[in-house]
């Protein structure tokens, strides 16, 4: 399985709160009838301050399903990741 980004990076590039991106991933996992566990792969992450953070590794399909916003920077970043 090839992961191309993380939910944290997607949030940063879209200028969105990571919590909003996590909510969108949860929504997608509920809506999509196929097994998405490999497209949205949960990992335990400890931030530099020692705080556990909920984080997902995303495949190209997972990123394509995720709305990262409509800003120029976010769209360019998403297009580059999906090449």
Name these PLM-found stretches.
Residues 1-83:
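An anion-engaging/catalytic patch
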